Structures are given as C-alpha cells and as structure tokens.
A protein has these predicted regions:
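Cleavable N-terminal export/targeting peptides
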Residues: 1-30
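Short loop/turn motifs that connect adjacent beta-strands in outer-membrane beta-barrel proteins
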Residues: 21-32, 63-64, 123-130, 203-209
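Outer-membrane beta-barrel proteins
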Residues: 26, 43-45, 57, 100-106, ...
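Residues that define the transmembrane beta-barrel architecture of outer-membrane proteins
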Residues: 32, 49-53, 108-114, 128, ...
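Gram-negative (and chloroplast) outer-membrane scaffold detector with strong preference
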Residues: 58-176, 184-193, 201, 294-296
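Short glycine/proline- and aromatic-enriched beta-strand/turn motifs that initiate or cap beta-hairpins
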Residues: 20-70, 74-87, 91-94, 269-296
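Acidic/polar loop-and-plug regions of large Gram-negative outer-membrane beta-barrel proteins
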Residues: 159-179, 252-269
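Predominantly the C-terminal beta-signal and adjacent terminal strand-loop region
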Residues: 204-296
Length: 296
C-alpha cells in the first residue's frame, strides 16, 4: 500500500512538473507583441538581393497572424589595380615605345530593398515556432564606377642612323554612370514577390534566433547607362612639349570633343551613336536568411 501511494505521488509530481514546463514554454511564444530583428544572408552569389543586412519589424495580430515590414541596405566597393609593361620594339625596331602603365578600377554598388508581408504561424512546440507567408516590395540596385589609366613611356625613333628619344605621358579617366566598369551590370529598378517559410527559436522570453528560406521573383527594368572618357596626351622632348591634347567623349550624347592644348585651331568635334542599355528583366532565385530578434 505504501509503495502504491509513493508511486501515485511521484506520478502526480511528474505531471505537475510537465504541466509547468509546458506553461513556461508557452510564455516564450509571442501573443500580440512587436518584434524587431536583424537578418543577413550568409551565402554569396551573383543575384543576392542585399549584400549586408536587413532590418525587419513584425506585429503579431494574434497567436497565428503577423504583418511585417523590412528595409535592407547593401553597399559594396571593390578596387583593382593592374600594372602592365609597354614594349613595342618587336613590332618596329626603328620606332617603338618602352615604359609601363597603371590601371586603377573602382566599382561601387548600392542595394535598396523595401518590403511588406504577412506571416501565418501554423505550429509551435514549446520554444519553436514555425511559420510561412508572402512578401512584396521594391528592389533597386545602383551601380557606378571609375577607371584611370596612367602610362609613362619613351618613344625611340631611329631615322638614317640618328636616334631620338621622346618622353610620353598619357592619362585616361573614365566615369561610368548606372553601370560598372565592365558594363555588364546596370542600375535596376523593380518589384519582387517572395513566398517563404521559417522557424523561430526563443532562447529567452524576449530573445529569439531563426532561419528562413524564400523563393523570390524579381521583375523590373535596367537604366540607360552612360560613360565619359577624358584622355590627355603629352609628348615632351627635353623641356619642350610637342603635343598636348585632351579628348572627351560621352556615350549619352555620342559626341567626342578634341582639344589641342597647344593650338586651339586644331580643336574639333565628331558625332557617333549614343548608346542605350535600358532593358527589362525577370529573375528567380532562392533567398536564405539567418535572423536574430528581440520582442517588445
């Protein structure tokens, strides 16, 4: 009889503890609360929407429904320098250049993403909360670049056994608007739609971490990109300049201006076709995210 009473008491105690644990775990789950979270994409790939991070806010209407608003900003700059030797002696031994050049390329990109969506929280087990939903919004990518080429060389000219050496300095600078230096990426404006599913794990009553996986369709247009080139050539024999001219070109107008800095009578202008890089696009990609948030 004593053993039976002890076993019954132990069973009641266990059930009581289990019930308390369940109630405590339920307290971790949101109910009509507001959360703020920081999310980032841990992977790197070409169509990655936001390169840095995104800030999301969620408002829980009830235990199963939440609306959310997110703002993401990404910024990236890369710089590349290329050194090259100049030697055209093998082409013409009587008139060749020898020297070196340095090319510096700097690409800059900015990404802006703004979206609003709905979440349906369909299951929870203690501290784990599972959800799915959809989101729509604006996604823009902005590109710009600069390229500078500095070359110094010596022209070696031999005529009838007489050799003349001339110092030459060339500088070229390019400014790219709405594209990168290779002109294979152009500024984009578009809308996106995402269906997603995710999970939250509540570490403490107001702190959670989570993961999300979405399938995104992005549609929009690319902007008409343009670039300008300024080229200065200086040819110096001793202390005297024999050439000093500047050439400028704009792809937006298709006009090239040639300015002779030593003799303005040689100035001239030529016209070419203006370029147009505007186009429409549709992209589909998978978008993973790691999240950490706080409940208010």
């Amino acid at each position: 009889m004593k053993k039976f009473i002890f076993a019954a008491a132990l069973s009641l105690t266990t059930l009581s503890l289990n019930a308390q644990t369940t109630e405590e775990d339920k307290d971790y789950l949101p109910d009509g609360t507001f959360t703020v979270e920081w999310r980032f994409n841990p992977f790197s790939y070409e169509s990655k929407p936001v390169n840095v991070a995104q800030l999301n806010g969620r408002l829980f209407i009830n235990e199963t429904s939440a609306v959310r608003l997110g703002i993401g900003v990404g910024f990236n700059t890369d710089k590349d320098e290329q050194k090259q030797n100049i030697n055209s002696q093998s082409v013409n031994a009587n008139n060749y250049d020898i020297g070196n050049s340095l090319t510096t390329i700097k690409n800059t990109s900015l990404t802006l993403k703004v979206g609003a969506g709905y979440e349906y929280h369909f299951a929870n087990t203690g501290r784990l909360d599972f959800y799915g939903g959809g989101e729509v919004g604006y996604l823009g990518r902005f590109y710009s670049a600069t390229k500078t080429i500095n070359a110094t060389s010596t022209n070696v000219l031999t005529i009838s056994g007489t050799t003349t050496k001339t110092q030459i300095a060339d500088t070229e600078s390019y400014d790219y608007s709405n594209s990168n230096a290779d002109r294979d990426k152009f500024t984009e404006h578009g809308i996106f739609g995402t269906v997603f599913t995710g999970i939250d794990f509540y570490i403490y009553r107001k702190l959670y971490v989570g993961a999300e996986l979405g399938l995104t369709v992005n549609a929009g247009t690319t902007s008409n990109a343009s670039w300008t080139r300024n080229k200065t050539h200086r040819s110096v024999v001793g202390a005297n300049e024999t050439e000093n001219w500047t050439e400028s070109f704009s792809s937006e107008t298709g006009i090239t201006n040639y300015v002779d800095n030593l003799n303005n009578n040689n100035n001239r202008q030529s016209a070419d076709y203006a370029t147009d890089s505007s186009d429409s696009f549709i992209k589909v990609y998978v978008e993973p995210a790691i999240r950490i948030g706080w409940m208010f």
